[in-house]
């Protein structure tokens, strides 16, 4: 790497800077990697070159005949993220990162590229790193804080480390100076990123300004312990579909099916994993869904960054802690198991608590929850202070529902329903009604009340209420024992069928427009829908994707909005971290600006905007 040198001409007192590529932001970022990771400049350049080869190979297979360079330049102008809960990926470091937040070793990059080159039809089998040399052999794992980390970030990192320590057999030790051997260095870098597994010597974890959230920090530590992203597992396509037409073309390599020998360790797929992509990962507009759950009830579950899920922890415990607690005889119920850090205690699935996971989890900042024994008569359950003044931020409740012997639990949502609206639920009610109470359930938020009736697979169900950021009405549910057959899902979400890539020699040849996506909001002209078309020639002029307004019927009167409410329904899929407080007018059905209510239909006096508002990318 060439540097800037200052030459002082003493006779004229003129300072001239002779600068080369050291002023290049990419090279300045490269110095960040060299400072915080055990990596030489040549190795860093090799990893970058391998990542470019992966991108070009994946791009050529998906968009045959199109120019990768042109797409890469256009994509570099846009913001990208792997989850709306994790912040956007810093453009300076993205050339060095795989799947948005993974800094690969040279060996890992070579292995992935080889797998891609050999067989394009198979999937890289990943959940936990299979390379045994990449696991941490010596405990405690030493770590230090770089001088760039501020006090608040340090407190969040310590909290995340303690969660890992409490839930697993892994231990950590903070050291002030750089020790000999292997260690982790937390630093405030250009975004959130980490390496996969132990790589030897100094190994950085970047916790940038947009990453200071416990779930994000736990995610990056998870990578360092050996966890890949959840949707990279070999069984992922049984639970999600990848909508290629909505992915930024030069990032298609972060979704392709590949093949390698990396183990899932027998842990079930978890749509609520903190390691899972969000629904708009690498999206062309940060709104269109690129990851669609086959069961649409899970759509707003994926991408959470609140905390590790039960199965996230179980993966690490299976990899590192199998020999712990062998001599203990603690018995745990409902899918719980002995806590490796303290074998006399049970580690319980979310929503469960007690000494043996036999009861509901303790509530937080509210008097709520409990064990409810059901009969054939309906019993009602509601969130704290429902409906007025409604729930508050940072509350949690859980209810353990038990049907009569030989029967199941039936659940229906009734009356008003309203939560902070985000693409990944931050405030939500969760239903765990499958026969696996360990796995994450359906999470519901926003203000569209689920209209179907749910029936559990067994005689047990769990309801969890969680609020993190906002205040709102909440929910009311009625539940009873039933002989009905299980109803735990609805038809899969279907968006667009992708055509096989075909390239023709003629210029500017577009395929037909695909189907419209679902509207992002249900009323008031508040949402958008989109559709895409593929370029069949090497290059096309015109828009690839177009957007339109939708659901122009005015939103119904909300009888509870006479109080102060946050305008969280206009977040456009992003987390409302700041509440815009206003007194809502509640005497008539509502429309979102610039629309106004005209006889129950949202219209605008701007030309053509009352019908379809077109945008393009």
Swiss-Prot record:
Disruption phenotype: Worms exhibit a trail of old cuticle that remains attached to the posterior part of the body. Glycans are attached at residue 174. Residues 368-482 form the CUB domain. Residues 507-556 form the TSP type-1 domain. This is Zinc metalloproteinase nas-36. PROSITE patterns: ASTACIN (PS51864), CUB (PS01180), EGF_1 (PS00022), TSP1 (PS50092), ZINC_PROTEASE (PS00142). The lineage of its organism: Eukaryota, Metazoa, Ecdysozoa, Nematoda, Chromadorea. Its EC number is 3.4.24.-. It comes from Caenorhabditis elegans. It is an enzyme of class 3 (hydrolase). Residues 23-126 form a propeptide. InterPro entries: Astacin-like_dom, CUB_dom, MetalloPept_cat_dom_sf, Metallopeptidase_nem, Peptidase_M12A, Peptidase_Metallo, Sperma_CUB_dom_sf, TSP1_rpt. Disulfide bonds join 169-321, 192-211, 325-346, 348-357, 368-397, 425-445, 519-550, 523-555, 535-540. It is found in: Secreted. The active site is at 220. Its main location: secreted. Its cofactor is Zn(2+). Residues 317-358 form the EGF-like domain.
